[in-house]
Amino acid sequence: MRDSQNTAQTLTESLKYFLKYRDQTVVIKYGGNAMIDEKVKESILKDILLLKTVGIKVVLVHGGGPAIGELLEKYEQKSQFVQGLRVTDKKTAQLALTALAGKVNKSLVQDIIRLGGNAIGVSGIDGKLIEAKPISEDLGYVGEITAIHPEIIERINQTDAVPVIASAGIGLDGEIYNVNADTAASRIAGALSAEQFILLSDVRGLYGNFPDEESFIDEINLTNLEKLVKEKKITDGMIPKIEAIKYAMFEGLGQAVLLDGRVPHALLLELFTDKGQGTMINH
């Protein structure tokens, strides 16, 4: 009886958040170890289905996880790197698209349907969703995002399906480009003027002195975030994520959250409780 009362109390307390986010857009970037662990993946997808059920326009953007590397290895495509970026020839770009849109994307759509929901999978090349141009000749088919055309997402959001987006780009020349998934997700969030952008990662969020838990940052604005970057208190792997978030916020994004995707039901805890889970970044 007490457990039932606690559940009812929790649902009642969550009501204000259901109302806050109803009919609002929440973009979720999914990647890292959260894509590898099947239990974690199922927890995340169940959370997403609940968000959709209570009237939130959820957009799921994903990277390739280990699938791209596995496919390149299978076809004996060796990777070369210039300044930390993978040099991408035309064959590698095609294989990356196969892994992203053919394997990972359709697997996520299949899982969402298996769990009782509905989903439509598209890649960034569909409807010129993610328009890109080459960063440099040295990197080949590595793309810089030049525009987002979100109409295809907006049409899917008018249905009962969750749009699942594979982060590939297409140029005006019709060529396919490898684009950074964090950047793609944040640019999509900005283009949709999303209420919130949630970037799932493998850490809890931001720290003033990582990994000291006492220095964990619950909430920060852009000004103080810049100070952390200048003081080099943010690790190298987190900097591209921060830059992507900053750009999206200038484009119209409301708030962003860095969240540990490995925590069970992290999305629900972040969106529907007072305390939240990760680091919230606001204007």
Curated annotation (Swiss-Prot):
Pathway: Amino-acid biosynthesis; L-arginine biosynthesis; N(2)-acetyl-L-ornithine from L-glutamate: step 2/4
GO cellular component annotations of the record: cytoplasm
An individual GO BP term: L-arginine biosynthetic process
Site (Transition state stabilizer): residue numbering on this chain: K29, K241
Homology family: Belongs to the acetylglutamate kinase family. ArgB subfamily.
Keywords: Amino-acid biosynthesis, Arginine biosynthesis, ATP-binding, Cytoplasm, Kinase, Nucleotide-binding, Transferase
Natural source organism: Lactococcus lactis subsp. cremoris (strain MG1363)
UniProt key word Amino-acid biosynthesis: yes
Catalysed transformations (reactions): N-acetyl-L-glutamate + ATP = N-acetyl-L-glutamyl 5-phosphate + ADP
Gene name per UniProt: argB
Nucleotide-binding recorded as keyword: yes
Pfam family, one: AA_kinase
Main localization category: cytoplasm
Enzyme class: transferase
Chain positions recorded as substrate binding sites: G64, G65, R86, N178
Protein name (database record): Acetylglutamate kinase
